[in-house]
Amino acid sequence: YGYRMTAEDFINKGQLHVTHMPGNAKKADWMAFINDFVISFGRKLIDMVHSYGKKAYVFYDDSWVGVEPYNGRFQEFGFDGLIKCVFSGYEARLCAGVDVPTHELRLHPYLFPVGLGGAPTFMEGGDPALDAKKYWNSVRRALLRAKIDRIGLGGYLHLVEGFPDFCDYIEKVADEFRLIRSFHDAGEPYHIKTRVAVLHYWGSLRSWTLSGHFHETYMHDLIHINEALSGLPVDVKFISFEDVKNGILKDVDVVINAGR
């Protein structure tokens, strides 16, 4: 790249470089540099998994630095599937929009004694069935717009023994999911003619997301817009200012610019 990075390039006067802020050329160079390494090393690991007749999935959450499912190079890894844990509809769209054979959602609440912020979940005082209903209501509307192949839960299975109402509700969720998936197998969902573009610095690289889950980024307008759009019957694309310069707006009816 012809130059050295400095500490300030990362610290950015204390603002860091979270993706709900505009980036710069150095940030883009760093992301490309890391992406090159992760692809080259990750592909070796995936080939190793495949050599034993197994499939390789990537968990699109806790740490996906250098994976970049939306930068056009994700297919170079050779992953067989993508797993995304979801609280909200936009996260379901984030998973569904990646070009990979299998898309899977990990539903909340996780099978842990406590949940967000230390609140009781699968323990005295918890109501995991109510939590599951709240999250499923948000996720389900997005599933009607984009196909997901599988759903699942994570955690300690024995914890559900004392919560039969949770087990009954998850059975209902599974049945609803199978029905929704069958709709997608039958054909594309209905869309009205309106074509919406969300415009910000990152464009398609940060389709359907900012810097984390809804409860971590609720203070930013853009996450609310993403969530609203995730279940609406409109065509949605994420575009950058460079895309605008190249004439992409000729194929767009509504432009939303709600970045920082």
PLM regions and their residue ranges:
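Carbohydrate-binding surfaces of carbohydrate-active enzymes
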Residues: 43, 50-51, 62, 88-111, ...
